[in-house]
Amino acid sequence: MMRRSKRGFTLVELIVVIAIIGVLAAIVVPTALHFVNEGKIEAAESDCSTILRTLEINIGRLAVGTSYTLDGAQVAQILNTYLGGDPAEETYVSIVTADNVSYTLSVTSPVQKDGVDISYQRTYTPQSILTVVPCVVVFRNGTWA
């Protein structure tokens, strides 16, 4: 009598392999997603810090004693000219005047950390005669406006 050779896998073997793959996926996928989210948060924090530094440097270049008006158009021009890279869509910069002497720059990203939008702000007292017009500038479709 001739014996037939077995070919393929049994149903039990297939179920065991599928179960092992499922367990591995349950462990690996959440960990990978965590690292992706952490990367987005770090990128948004870096973008906010870079935007503040870019504005600080370029506003600080104004000659002492000169008169200058800083408004939304000027902020957009500075960011479009000197800022490399693209922040998250809908990142925005706002300028608020505290008094006639100082102003506060605030950069906010739509990326959230612990359920709150990432936001950096600094208050400045300019050395030049600076007139600050409160404004909001938003990054949309690859440009600041």
Where are these regions (language model features)?
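N-terminal leader/signal peptides at the extreme start of proteins
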Residues: M1-F9
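Alpha-helical hydrophobic helix detector
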Residues: I15-T31
